[in-house]
Amino acid sequence: MRKAIATISFLGLGLALFAVACYAQQDKSKRPSPPAQATFELGGGQSVTVDYSSPRAKGRKIYGDVVPLGKVWRTGANEATTFVTTADITVGGSAVPPGSYTIFTIPDKDKWTLIISKKTGEWGTDYPGTSSDLARVDMKVSSLPTPVENFTISFDKSATGGTMNIDWESTRASVAIGKK
């Protein structure tokens, strides 16, 4: 009897470990909110790269419903959004040294706040708190002419640097980025 219980326990443990290994190796591109990346070339081999998961609107009201207004949001889906710069830059006027960061936002009707957190490896909305903030900057909010189904982060280049844009539903939040 003890041998049977030991065998069943061993098989159960083996099955659990197999399931965890399979889950860890799943194809992230098949998720409902697949991974996406935006890169801004600063010149001289230096860049800013944002890795995020791109949820879909699917007919839902996004801001004020799926994404609450006035509260910290993970800015995408799944793992927290990463922001990596290989150069000294400014984001919304705040200095950001080379490194890897997590970004969060606080969406609101007329103004968003971009939070650049020194703590990385977060999952979802696990905002580590203001003690981990490198910077908090205001983002300009505007309306898009046509709704955007897939949450998107992109960069526009300008004569003085560029702009990071966050587009979803009918809203664009943007912030200036420049090389220091």
Kindly label every feature range from the protein language model:
Residues 25-71, 120-180:
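Primarily secretory-pathway and cell-envelope proteins
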Residues 12-13, 63, 90-92:
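Alpha-helical interaction segments
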Residues 15-17, 67, 79, 127:
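Polar low-complexity intrinsically disordered regions enriched in Ser/Thr and small residues
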Residues 9-19:
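Bacterial N-terminal signal peptides
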Residues 73-122:
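Mid-length scaffold segments of soluble, non-membrane domains
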Residues 1-7:
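Positively charged n-region of N-terminal signal peptides that target proteins for export
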